[in-house]
Amino acid sequence: DFIGIEGELFTTKVGAQCIRVDKFTFLSKTLRPLPLPKVDEDGKVHDAFNDAELRYRMRYVDLTVNQNVKDTFIKRTKLFTAMRGYFNDAGYLEVDTPVLQSIPGGASARPFITHHNSLDIPLYMRIANELYLKRLIVGGFEGVYEFSRNFRNEGMDRTHNPEFTAMEIYVAYKDYNWMMEFAEGLLEHCAIAVNGTSEVTFGEHQINFKAPYARVTMTDSIKHFTGFDISGKTEEELFAAAKGMGIEVDETMGKGKLIDEIFGAKCEGNYIQPTFITDYPKEMSPLCKEHRDNPDLTERFELMVCGKEIANAYSELNDPIDQRERFEDQMRLAAKGDDEANGIIDEDFLRALEYGMPPTSGMGIGMDRLIMYLTNNASIQEVLLFPQMRPEKKQTIELSEEEKLIVALLKANENKMDLAQLKVTAALSGKKWDAATKGLSKNNLIKVSVDGESKVMELVE
C-alpha cells in the first residue's frame, strides 16, 4: 500500500535519518503483492521476477522490482539527451514529419497499411522519414534532424521490432566523408555521456567507440571473406555465386538484394569493433549519390558494430533525373516480386528536387540497437519499455467438482439463480460451498448482485 507520513526529521544516535511520525495518511491500496526477490544467507536469490515474457508483459512490475531494468531506461533517456544536445550545439534544427504517409518512401521495407476514412485513401505507417527531411533541406534549412517512430511490417527477432526508434539527420554542403567524421565524434560523445567512458562491454566483447573507426569498402569486404569480386558482375553471375556459397536466394532478387544477401551472410558478422563499410554498389542505394570516382558505386557507408548495422549514411542524390531513373528501377523490382522494393514513384519529392537541393549528407541511426550496445543487452525487447508481443492467451482453468456443480446449476437456469436457492439446490457443506464460490470468484467466473431483498449469483460471460 502507499502511505503518506507527516512528522519531524531527526538523526538517531547511530547516525540514521528517521522521521518521528505525527500523522499517517492512506494514499492508495495495492490489491496484488509484488514478486519481491529474496536473498538467503548464502547469497542465492529466490522468487526473482525473471521470466522474460512476464517481464515484458508486466513492465510496470519489472521496473518496480528489478533496479537494473530501470537503470537501462534511464541510460536510454541519457542517450537521447546527449545526442540531441550534440546536434543542437552544432546549430541543427529538430523537426517533426508525418507518421501517416501516402507513399512509403525512404527505405526498402514492407509497410503497415491503414485507411483514412474521411479522405477515403490508403495510408502507410512511416518506414522512414528521409524524403520529408530532404524536402526541408530544399526549403532552405541547412541542418535538420528528427527522432522518429518507424514501422516495418517484417519479422521479429532479438534485434528487430516492428515499431522502432530511429534518428535521421541531414546537413547541407557536406558529403559522406564529413559524415563519417561527424558520426565518430557523435558516438564517442554519446558513449561517454551514458557510461562515463567510450569503452563498453557487450556480451563477450569489449567495444571502443573512441574515434577514429576502420573503413572498408563493400567490394573489398566481400572479396576478403568470400574470394568473390562483385565488381562488374551481372545479376545472373551474382545469383550463381550466392547459390554456390549456400545462401538462400530466389528469382525476385535484383543485383542489389543479391549483394546484400552475400554481405549479410558472409561478411557482416565479422565486424565487432566500429567499422565503416563504404562505397556500396548503385543497385543497393536508390537514394544515394553516384560515387565521384566510379559510376557503378555510390557514396554510402554503414557503420557496423558487433556484426550489426547501427548507422547508414549517404552523400544524398540531388539530381531529379537520376532520382527518377532509380525510382523506375525500384518499380521494376517491385513488379518482379520484391516486396521490399518501392513500387510507387514519389512525384512530389521529385518536384522538390527540381527546385534544387544543395549537396547534402544524411545519416540514420537505429537508436534501439545503439542503446543495446551501450547497456549490454542482447535483446531489443530489453531496451523497449513495451515491446510488441502476441496477445496473452487465457489460462485454462481447472474446476473442482463442487465448482463444476455450481456452474452446471447456473447454466441450467439461464446463467443466474437466487443465491439462497442455489445454495440449497447444490446441497454442499458450508466449507465446500465457501471454497467453491471463492474459487469461481477468483477466476472471474461468477458475480453476485442484489435484486430487491434477495441476492442473485450469475455466470460472467
Residue ranges and their predicted role:
Residues 396-403, 450-461:
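Short, cationic-aromatic polyanion-contact patches
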Residues 428-442:
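Short amphipathic alpha-helical interaction segments
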